[in-house]
Amino acid sequence: IIARVSQSLAKEQSLESLVRQLLEMLEMVTDMESTYLTKVDVEARLQHIMFARNSQKMHIPENFTVSWDYSLCKRAIDENCFFSDEVPDRWGDCIAARNLGITTFLSTPIHLPDGSFYGTLCAASSEKRQWSERAEQVLQLFAGLIAQYIQKEALVEQLREANAALIAQSYT
């Protein structure tokens, strides 16, 4: 895993490319059917599934938006419970979890280096799976890598905008 992560980070690539590789590795470590990255718009109270990897019967759709207030991820954060292998019992009123058939859920929030909340990195399965310290550590490591990459992309965009403004100003 470490070698693959190093190779992924060494290549200059898009956020999507990096995340897809990390989701695949996360699936192997967690033994979950689906792994996915979400972005949360706290003001609009919406959670958007940006990228998902589905390897078995469970299918978490990409480009799918759900109410943040009723999501498993928000409940996990609010209750400080980032793993459950009893989702139907613990969060049985969560419609999305029930419709997707989620039994086991693992999640971690993603905070950008400036401290702002970005979204979540999650893994889910319709089968009961055991908690693993290794899986949780990898999940948190990958969340940190994604946060760093997002921050890097934002800084590069700011530099491009500043450069364009300087060029435009030089013509005046």
Residues of each region from the PLM?
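A short, aliphatic-rich beta-strand micro-motif
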Residues: 103-112
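Allosteric cytosolic regulatory segments
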Residues: 140-147
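Short N-terminal helix-loop-first-beta-strand/juxtamembrane motif that initiates sensory/input modules
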Residues: 31-35
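GAF sensory/regulatory domain recognition
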Residues: 24, 36-64, 68
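Short beta-strand-to-loop transition segments that serve as allosteric relay/switch motifs
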Residues: 55, 119-130
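Signal-transducing coiled-coil linker helices
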Residues: 7-22
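Acidic/proline- and glycine-rich, intrinsically disordered low-complexity segments
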Residues: 58-82, 93
